[in-house]
Amino acid sequence: WRNPGPSLRDKGWDDYMQLGPLAAMDAVTETTGEERMNVIGYCIGGTLLGSTLAWLKKKRRNPVASATYLTTLLDFSDPGGIGVFINDHSIRGIERLLERKGYLDGRAMAFTFNLLRENDLFWSFWTNNYLKGQKPAAFDLLYWNTDGTNLPAKMHSFYLREMYLNNRLVQPDALTLAGESINLSGIDVP
């Protein structure tokens, strides 16, 4: 694992699938000798896991005994509060930034999440720290939220357009990953 910078700008969803979950599953099998495993995906990692399981199903590979998803979107038809930021105009603006920089800075993502809970994660700190001069109280969620992960340009653009804007992940065979069209409804992993 590493935090991507400009040199990884052309890494896409396919690359993340092949170099992430698929490589990890191969490493588990090679290290332990076990051919089936239990897996977990969190947030965008869960979306990647769902994509991977659909791809594995298409390839008739079955290394996963069970899958657990935590705060994961697979159907993006109602993404919650972040949906106000998802439209073609906004995405084109983000893509212009991605073209220049090569990646989305994790701090930009953290700021977006802060705005989703602006009273708790933004304005209270602005008021108390800046206006009132109070020392901020320790808050573990804020530390976690500032430990952002950069996202490569190609992967992030794909994620925004294909998942959020067009909701193609839940459309059978609407996405092709590593040469295979995928269908989430074909996944039979508990």
Regions flagged by a language model, labelled:
Residues 1, 71-72, 180:
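Fold-independent oxyanion-binding glycine-rich loops
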Residues 8-9, 13, 36-40, 148, ...:
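Conserved aromatic-histidine-acidic binding/catalytic patches
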Residues 40-45, 49:
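Gly/Ala-rich beta-loop-alpha elbow adjacent to hydrolase catalytic centers
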Residues 2-4, 23, 45, 54, ...:
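Short, glycine-/Ser/Thr-/acidic-enriched flexible segments
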Residues 30, 34, 48-156, 167:
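Alpha/beta-hydrolase-fold enzymes
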Residues 138-190:
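C-terminal subdomain of alpha/beta-hydrolase-fold enzymes, centered on the catalytic histidine
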Residues 1-31, 81:
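Cap/lid segment of the alpha/beta-hydrolase catalytic domain
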Residues 34-37, 189:
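Short coil/turn segments at beta-strand junctions that form active-site/ligand-binding loops
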